[in-house]
Each structure stands twice: as structure tokens, then as C-alpha cells.
């Protein structure tokens, strides 16, 4: 038999990967090689998902602002342009929150920008 001097290290690494693979279906949570591949893929998906979430929320905010502004008779790009010209520093998240929760304040804001 060949003597293995890194047994503890390998066991720790295997345990770490199998712990990360907990909850995966079938052999994806039982066998090290397959679990390792699935963990790497899951981490990659998680990384991309965190980047994608920022884009999706920004587009959601823009959609909400656009819908609220169209009720007042203008469109999104004109509204944002007039906000910038008048040096009103509200970001899209705040504007979308205003449009959803406090329509009266949002109406006042659109009147200011006209």
C-alpha cells in the first residue's frame, strides 16, 4: 500500500465540499467529485445572480417610475432629464418608492419638474 501523508487535509476538503452540497439531490450531495462540480456551478450561479439582481431591480424601478409618470402625462426620459436640470438628487430607488407608496408626493414632484 502507498502511504498517504495528506489524509487529514483531503478529508477536511471533502467534508467542506460535501457540507456546501447539503440539500442537493441524489449523488450531487453524496459523492465528492459530483458534489464538487455542483458546488462550483452553484457558486458561479450565485455570483452571476448577485450581479443580475442589481440590473433587475434597476429595471423594475424604472418601469414603476415610467408607469407613474405616464399617468401625469409625461414620460420617463423627460422626467429624469428635468430632475437633473433642476438639481433634484433623488435616485431611481427613492423615486419608485415614492411612486408606489406616496402618490401625492410623487404628483407634487412631477408638477415641479414640468
UniProtKB/Swiss-Prot annotation:
GO terms for cellular component: chloroplast; ribonucleoprotein complex; ribosome. Keywords: Chloroplast, Plastid, Ribonucleoprotein, Ribosomal protein, RNA-binding, rRNA-binding. Disulfide bonds: none annotated. The keyword Glycoprotein does not apply. One of its GO terms (biological process) is translation. It comes from the Eukaryota. InterPro entries: Ribosomal_bL20, RIBOSOMAL_L20_CS, Ribosomal_protein_bL20_C. PROSITE patterns: RIBOSOMAL_L20. PANTHER family: 39S RIBOSOMAL PROTEIN L20. This is Large ribosomal subunit protein bL20c.
